[in-house]
Curated annotation (Swiss-Prot):
Its main location: cytoplasm. This is D-aminoacyl-tRNA deacylase. Keywords: Cytoplasm, Hydrolase, RNA-binding, tRNA-binding. Its EC number is 3.1.1.96. It comes from Salmonella typhimurium (strain LT2 / SGSC1412 / ATCC 700720). The lineage of its organism: Bacteria, Pseudomonadati, Pseudomonadota, Gammaproteobacteria, Enterobacterales. GO terms for molecular function: D-tyrosyl-tRNA(Tyr) deacylase activity; Gly-tRNA(Ala) deacylase activity; Ser(Gly)-tRNA(Ala) hydrolase activity; tRNA binding. The gene is dtd. SUPFAM superfamilies: DTD-like.
């Protein structure tokens, strides 16, 4: 399971001209689900994402996680993160989980975030989405479990 996380001052996702998720300061999480992923990996990745200390403390040091910083989380499914890009000029998506399994794990990940008392907004699984964000820093990390 892969999460591309970006520290943002604001972010939103729109599906068919409807804003489905919108946050102020916090994390935009682009989430990719791979074939071998399961609930245990989703739990570990959620723990890492929410615990990752990439927000500044009073001394300006990256020392706070999203909850300590009072931030929110916007989770957007992105199957392209599971692409194999090592060869050729076209990505292969054979490493990605089947859509029904990927959706179940995506929803599980979102629910785990919400259980941690974090304001968690979402896109719409498998939809054509427009994601708008202001990357703060920029600060972007690739987390994989």
């Amino acid at each position: 399971m892969i999460a591309l996380i970006q520290r943002v001052t604001r972010a939103s996702v729109t599906v068919e001209d409807e804003v489905t998720g919108k946050i102020g300061p916090g994390l935009l999480v682009l989430l990719g689900v791979e074939k071998e992923d399961d609930e245990q990996k989703a739990n570990r990745l959620c723990e890492r994402v929410l615990g990752y200390r990439i927000f500044s403390d009073a001394d300006g040091k990256m020392n706070l996680n999203v909850q300590q910083a009072g931030g929110s989380v916007l989770v957007v499914s992105q199957f392209t993160l599971a692409a194999d890009t090592e060869r050729g000029m076209r990505p292969s998506f054979s490493g990605g989980a089947a859509p029904d399994r990927a959706q179940a794990l995506y929803e599980y990940f979102v629910e785990r975030c919400r259980q941690q008392a974090i304001n968690t907004q979402t896109g719409r699984f498998a939809a054509d989405m427009q994601v708008e964000l202001v990357n703060d820093g920029p600060v972007t990390f690739w987390l994989q479990v």
